[in-house]
Amino acid sequence: MTGFEQEPDAAVALFGDRIELARRFAADLAREGETRGLIGPLELPRLWSRHILNSALVAPVLRVGVVGDVGSGAGLHGLVLAIARPDVRFVLIEPMERRVDWLLEEVQALGLDNVDVLRARAEDVRLATPLDQVTARAVSALSKLIPLTVPLLRSGGELVFMKGERVDAEIEAAAKVIRKAGLVDVRVEVLGEGVLPEVTRVFRATLR
């Protein structure tokens, strides 16, 4: 695992007594992620800071309940959040078979009994009970992501999307979509200031 980033000091603070599970996940991803097409070759030197800890910053935002993660991929951030928040039930939604296989393997290997994995596209998911929150990281622009995820939410449920520096422009471009979807209390929160080198921007909105 040449070039694997050393664990930053912030890791223990973010994961607490779940840090060993986070370390195991990081080691598994560093060992197999590139060969299985889960992460690119340039990600190992920043796997902790850019991906795992960046994802973990969202954990305190989550409510106790059932959270769906759309486009779970390598588990960044769905598995990371499931490690950090054992009191929350997670439904990881991912359409690609090889990624689903990885997610299922890690759920079993890490003993995560608060995770279900669905192989499906978000628009094809039919849940018996609507979700309390839906998360997504690096999936698509808000104008496309909102129509895919709002049908999964209960009334009063919340979208929690990790976004980049252009999130304000995305919100402006998606203004009509946001109104049509019935979203209120739309805001952007900046997380991780003074904790990690790069802050995390989170788009939050509540379904009426």
Predicted regions: what they are:
Residues V70-S72:
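Conserved beta-strand/loop positions that form the S-adenosyl-L-methionine
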Residues R89-R208:
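S-adenosylmethionine
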Residues V12-A13, R36-G37, P45-R46, A74, ...:
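Flexible, active-site-adjacent loop/turn segments at secondary-structure boundaries
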Residues M1-G68, I83-A84, R98-V115:
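Class I SAM-dependent transferase core
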Residues A74-D87:
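Conserved SAM-binding loop of SAM-dependent methyltransferases across substrates and taxa
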Residues G3, E7, A26, A30-R36, ...:
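A generic structural signal for ordered alpha-helices
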